[in-house]
Design a protein with these regions (language model features):
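Helix-loop element at the rim of GNAT/NAT acetyltransferase active sites that forms part
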Residues: 23-36, 43
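A short beta-loop-alpha structural element at the N-terminal edge
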Residues: 7-21
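Conserved acetyl-CoA-binding loop of GNAT-fold acetyltransferases
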Residues: 143-153
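Conserved GNAT acetyl-CoA-binding A-motif
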Residues: 115, 120-135
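C-terminal "cap" of GNAT-fold acetyltransferases
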Residues: 135-136, 154-173
Length: 173
């Protein structure tokens, strides 16, 4: 894991990086699932502390990110993806809205490290849990990050069938 820090920097998103985040999101997700620029700009503006970026040290290029909003709800619904007004900075739960890493940078542990950093920060902030939805093919990956599969989600974002997963932050090591 140490070598990941030799190549990459992990940090909070900066103002003006929404366009780059949308380009990454568009490369990683089909059009029916990807976030659009006006909404990404709102996420960057309203919840930057819940937006972790991976950047190449040598080039300064953003290569991936994890973003979320906070709420007092404990289940992810489709409206969280499009309505930033649902973000409650004091919320006890975070809803992970996107985990995206450019394809040429995958399988190095970047998503896991961005998630680890976000979850540790939110645990320290007193939040109870993180919730996400994922396709069946990603369930095992998220289990390795400490998530528990709750079964099929109420979310039908993008017309897909999703698994809802939760990570209880106070149980994290």
């Amino acid at each position: 894991m140490e070598e990941i820090y030799e190549k990459y920097v992990f940090r909070t998103v900066r103002k003006g990086e929404a366009e780059t985040a949308v380009a990454i999101e568009t490369a990683c997700f089909p059009p029916n699932e990807a976030c659009v620029l006006p909404i990404m700009k709102q996420r960057v503006k309203m919840a930057p502390e819940l937006f972790i970026v991976a950047e190449e040290k040598n080039t300064g290029k953003m290569i991936g990110f994890v973003n979320a909003i906070a709420t007092d709800e404990n289940s992810l619904r489709d409206e969280f993806f499009t309505d930033i007004r649902l973000h409650n900075p004091q919320g006890k739960y975070i809803m992970i809205l996107s985990v995206a890493v450019l394809s040429e940078y995958r399988h190095q542990g970047l998503a896991k490290e961005m998630m680890r950093q976000l979850l540790n920060r939110q645990k320290e902030a007193g939040r109870l849990a993180a919730v996400l939805t994922c396709l069946d093919s990603k369930v095992e990956m998220y289990k390795k990050m400490g998530y528990v599969d709750l079964g099929i989600s109420q979310s039908s974002w993008g017309g897909e069938e999703w698994h809802e997963m939760i990570c209880h932050l106070q149980n994290m090591e």
